[in-house]
Amino acid sequence: MIDDPDYPRQWEADVVLGDGGTARLRPIRSDDADRLRSFHSRLSKETVYNRFFAFRPVLSDPDIARFTQVDHVDRVALVATLRDDIIGVVRYDRLPGSSDGEVAFVVEDAHQGRGLGPALLEHLAAAGRERGITRFVADTLPTNRAMLGVFRTAGFQVHRVLADGYVELSFPIRPTDSSVSVMRDREHRAEARSVKRLLAPRSVAVIGASREPGAPGHELLHSLLSSGFCGPVFPVNPAAAEVGGLTAYSDVREVPGPVDLALIAVPAAEVADVVRACGVKGVHGLVIVSGGFADAGPEGRARLEEVVALARESGMRLIGPNAMGVVNTDPAVRLFATFAAGAPAAGRVGVFSQSGALAGSFLAEASRRSLGLSSFVSIGDRADVSGNDLLQYWRADERTEVVLLHLQGFGNPRKFARIAREVGRVKPVVALKSGHGQPGRSDAAVGALFASAGVVRVGSLAQLFEVAQLFALQPLPAGRRVGILGNSSALAAMAADACHDLGLDVPPLDETSQVRLRELTGTTQTVNPVDLGPFAGPAELRSALTVLGDSGQVDAVLAVVVPPPRGRPEVVAELGAALREAPPAMTVLATFLGGDGVPAGLAAPGDGAPGRGSIPSYASPEAAALALSRAMDYAEWRARPEGEVPELRRFDVDAAKDRLVGLDTDGRWLPLPEVTALLQPLGIDIWPTSLAADAEQAVAAAQALGWPVALKAVAEQWRHRLDVGAVRLGLTGPDELRAAFGDVRSVVGPGPLYVQPMAPPGVSTVVRLVQDSSAGALLSLRLGGVAVDLLVDPVTRTLPLTDRDARALVRSIRGHQLLTGAPGSAPADVEALEDLLLRVAQLAEALPGVAELVLDPVLVQRNGVAPLHVGLRLREPGADPDRGPRRLGSSYAVL
C-alpha cells in the first residue's frame, strides 16, 4: 500500500532482462522493510561484503529505516521485484551542496548475470536527471568485478581512480550517443531472448488440454504431438487422468520437472488463476488462446489488466490473449502450437499476424505457395509481446531472411520505425497495414512511417506473399532494368506495360546482344521484350537467359511462359529447369503456366520448402511486375547510405525550453510574437512582421521595417489570397499603404493586418511538423501557392531525419526542379532548405510538446530561406515510450 503523497509512480516500470525474463522496478516504499530484510538474508557473504565493505549478517532497524525512508529527491532508491520479493536495490544520496549523487546497488546472487544491474542503473540515472542530479559517484572494491562490470558496460564515460584500496568512480549521467546505443543494444538482446524463450521452449504444458476434437485445447495438443515437438509435452486437465495418450495433471504445479512454455486454453474467468499457478511453477512464458478479454468490454479489459500484471509479477512474457498460437519450424524445436489449419514447411520467412482470424489464411497460403516459414506468431490482443518484440527476435534469428507483418496498429510507432529500420538493413520487412479507413488513422502517415523505415508496403494478403516469395528465393535486383522474354508476345507486351507503369526500365538491348539472340534462338523479336515464339523449347529459353545475363544491360529477368502447343509434361519440366539455370546474381521471376507460388518445375532443392534459386511464379505479368518493383525499391533504400543526424550550430534547446514556460498548451495557435521568440534560439528566423490595428499603425510599421512592404490578412483562410485582394504586395509609400489597408479590410472584414517588408524572390514551399496519433512526429514538404495547395500532396517523413533524409526529401517533392534548377532558371539555395528541415525535425525531438508547426510559405531564395509566416500549437507532452530507460509498454494497447 502506498501512503506517500510524493511517491513517484512515473518511475514504476516493467523491464525485460538480459536472459529474456522480466522484473518490476519501482521506488522503494516504507512497507518494504520485511522484504528488504528477507532480501538481505539471501545475499552471500561476498555480495554483502562488496556492498558494505564489511560483513553485515543482518540489517538493524535503523539500517532498515534509513534504507526505506527516502524523499525521492535527494535520497532515491529503486527496487527490482519478482513475485513480490525484492531481488535488487539501487540508490543514490545527493552529496551536500552539489548535483552529484553517490550511487550503490546490490543484486541477489541468484539473479546476478541477468542484466538486472544495468537496468537498475539506467532507471536510477533517469530519476536522478529528473531531480537535478548530473553526475554519479561511487566507491567500490577492486575485487567487486560485478559492480565494475556494470559501470564499464553501461555506456557512460566512467572516470576511475584507485585510491586507498578503493576504486573511485564518477560519470555524468546525461545520455550520450554511446550510452543510448549501449542501452538499445541491451534492449535488442533482451527482447530477442524473451521471444526466443517463447518460440524455442524445451518443454510445454497445455493447460486446458481436451479430449474433444475441435476444442482449442485438443487442437493445440494434437498439433504439438503430430508435428513431433522435440521436448516433453504435459497435458493439464483436472478432470482427466490421460489426454492424447499422455498422463494429465490437475494443476501445472504438479508437473514433474520444469515447464518453459504454457499454452493456456481455459475459459477467460479461469485464466488469472492459471497464470498465478504458472508463476509459482516458474514457467518462462505463456501463450493464451482464450478469448473474452479485449473483445469483452470493460469487464474483459479489467481481466486482461489482471492477467498481464500477474504474468509480469512472476517474470513471464505472454502472447495473446485471443492468440491463434505460434509455430517454430526449426528442426531442433518443431513447435507447432496453434489450432489454425495448415502446416507450412521449414523455410526462411518469419510471419507476424495481429489478427487471429487471419492466422489460418497465412498458414494455408504459405502452404499453397510452397513458401517455407521459419516461425509464425499470431499475437491476438497484443497485451504484452508485440510486433516490435518479434522484429527484435527476427533481427537476430539466422534462420529468418524475410519478415512478413500484418498490422492493425502501432503500440509505439517511434520504436517500430527504429527497429524496422535496423532489421531492414539486413533483411526485408514486408507489411500489410489494415485499418487505414478507420476515423483518425492517416494512411499517409503510415506510408511515411514505412517509407522512412524501409518497410515494403503491400495492399493485400496476396501481394504480401507475392513479394515475400521473391525476397525469399531470389537475390535482390542490382537496379531497375528489366529484361522480358517468353513464348507469348501478348503476355510480354502486358509485362512491359506493367513495368513501365511502375517506374521500371525496359531498355532496348544493344546490337551485339540482339545478334546473339537471333543466332542462338532463331527469333527476330530481340529488342526487349524478347519473343521466342510459341514453339520455343528449353534450349532457346536457356540461350536467351544467357545472352541477357551476359549483356550487362538488365538487372532482372521476367519470363512469361505459357504451355507450348501439344507440350508434353517433360517439356514443361525442362522449361522450368532452363529458367533455374539463369546466372546466379540475376533476379529471375516468371509468369509460368499461369500458376502462382513455386511450381515443382521451378523449385530448387531446399530443406522442406523450395530453396534459394527457385523461380517464383505469378498468376499475371502485373503481379510479377509489382513484386519486382517493390524489391527494386527496397534494394535502392538498402543501398542508400543512412546519413547522420548533424549537430546544428545556433541550436540552443535550453533557451527554447525556457521560452516555453508559461505558454498555453491547450492546442490553440499561439500569438506570432511568442512563436517567433520560441524559434529564434533554434536558428529558425521568421521574416519580420508587425501587427497593425489601423492604417496609421501600418504606416508606422512600414517606416520601421523599410519600404516596400506587403500587407496581409491575419486569418489563415485569407493569408495567401492574392487573387481576391486579401494580400497586397510591393507597397512603396504611406498613401498607397493607407489605401491598400482599406481595400484589404473590405475583403476580409474588421481586425488587424500584418505588415512585412518585401522579401527577395524565391520558390514558395510549405514545411509542416505534426504529431500523428498513429505514426508519431511527421515532417512534410511541398511547393507552396494557392493552386498547389489544392493539387499537390506533400511528401512526408517520420523522425529522426538525417542529412541524407533531408536531401532526399527536397528532391522527392513534385516540382522539385524549381528548387534544383529548372531549364532557364537558377537553382535555389536547397542547402538552406535542408538545414531548415533538419532544424524543424530536431525541434520535434527536443520539444515534444509541440503539437504542430507550420511554416507557410517558406521562400527558398538564391541565398538562404525566408519563412514568411509561422503557426505553432502546443500540447501537454506525454511520456515518449521510446525515450529514457527501456521499459515494457502498457498492458493493453488499443488496436
Question: At which residue positions do the language-model features occur?
Answer:
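Catalytic-core regions of core metabolic enzymes
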Residues: 174-895
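Long, contiguous binding/interaction regions
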Residues: 1-197, 201
